[in-house]
Amino acid sequence: MSDLEQLERQILEDIAAAVDEQGIEAVRVAALGKKGTVSEKLKTLGGMSPEERQMQGPAINGLKNRVTEALSERRTELRKAAVAARLEREKVDVTLPVRESAASRGRIHPISQVIDEITAIFADMGFSIAEGPDIETDYYNFTALNFPEGHPAREMHDTFFFNPDEKGERKLLRTHTSPVQVHTMEKFAAMRDKEGRDEPIRIVIPGKTYRMDSDATHSPMFHQVEGLVVDKSANVANMKWVLEEFCKAFFEVPSVKMRMRPSFFPFTEPSVEVDIQCDRSGPHVKFGEGNDWLEILGCGMVHPNVLRMSGYDPEVYQGFAWGMGIGRIAMLKYGMPDLRAFFDADVRWIEHYGFRPLDIPTLFGGLSA
């Protein structure tokens, strides 16, 4: 048996003896690493004569290829075995009777919990919950919200569009919950014109939105909540008070300092982004203290064009609106590191971060008590 055959036999035995990924990696480094046994054989080719190189080259390269293939096959086997073992450990016999315990009742997803917390806060301020369709028209998603033609948000790389229907109209998955604001304003304006009921609008809008984005802090489908107030006397001071009260209640702190920075949103004018004071020195963010600032939401006074297109005279009525990502503020409040985990359907994750079914958020009992 030649040296190459002995070396190959030894390496293949080591590969077969590996019982986990670390073992496979150790064999790979020992054989194919910079100073591995096969790598050292390859280095000897440089000192051989052309005739020797012609004979030994194919043999050594063949050894390298066979070792690489064996490593890949063994790694695949170990991964399949690990998955099978995990499935066996976590297997649930669905024919068994349900155990009457807290675990058998499941857990409330953090997104659902935070939506309940937010709506409980705004309901206490006199707001109603409004909802709308996930599939919208270009008009309600963009035009009625003062997005001009050619705006980047209208491009295919930002928005999920459907194929045009028989009328040539192209619908889309809404990129924000703002279309519900327009639907609501149109409804109230029609009620005012037909019935003479000129009622103020105070709504909060939780829902799913869709954009072509995916990383640790973004998801192609995410939850958003917006708020809208329209009245003859709505102003920036009202907006600031509402948002301060919300932040204090949501983060469960007695006081909070807010900082408003000028920004731009097509549907509001002026537009601002709101930062709140916090302490980020520890493993978890602490709100209401410290010297750091963290962006929490965007807001502004409803743009006159939006009011006008929704049936309101901007010379008579004013409004303010705000919006925030539900997943983002859930991560901030409860210390969740990766937004993608919200949608992985991992039972262990939901058991860790989820809430008991009877933990109904109330301002009296404490939102997350």
UniProtKB/Swiss-Prot annotation:
Keyword S-adenosyl-L-methionine assigned: no
Q: Which cofactor does it need?
A: Mg(2+)
Alphabetical list of InterPro entries matching this protein: aa-tRNA-synth_II, aa-tRNA-synth_II/BPL/LPL, Phe-tRNA-synth_IIc_asu, Phe-tRNA_ligase_II_N, Phe_tRNA_ligase_alpha1_bac, Phenylalanyl-tRNA_Synthase, tRNA-bd_arm
Compartment(s) of residence = Cytoplasm
Q: Which residues bind Mg(2+)?
A: 269
- Broadest EC class assigned to this enzyme: ligase
Q: Which reaction does it catalyse?
A: tRNA(Phe) + L-phenylalanine + ATP = L-phenylalanyl-tRNA(Phe) + AMP + diphosphate + H(+)
What EC designation does it have? Answer: 6.1.1.20
User: Record's GO cellular component, any one?
Assistant: cytoplasm
Q: How is the cofactor bound?
A: Binds 2 magnesium ions per tetramer.
For this protein, the record's Pfam families field holds: Phe_tRNA-synt_N, tRNA-synt_2d
Gene Ontology process terms (BP): phenylalanyl-tRNA aminoacylation
Q: Name one GO molecular function term.
A: phenylalanine-tRNA ligase activity
UniProtKB keywords: Aminoacyl-tRNA synthetase, ATP-binding, Cytoplasm, Ligase, Magnesium, Metal-binding, Nucleotide-binding, Protein biosynthesis
Q: What is its main location?
A: cytoplasm
Assembly information from the UniProt record: Tetramer of two alpha and two beta subunits.
Q: Which family does it belong to?
A: Belongs to the class-II aminoacyl-tRNA synthetase family. Phe-tRNA synthetase alpha subunit type 1 subfamily.
Q: Which HAMAP family does the annotation name?
A: Phe_tRNA_synth_alpha1
This protein's name: Phenylalanine--tRNA ligase alpha subunit
**Organism source for this protein?**
Brucella melitensis biotype 1 (strain ATCC 23456 / CCUG 17765 / NCTC 10094 / 16M)
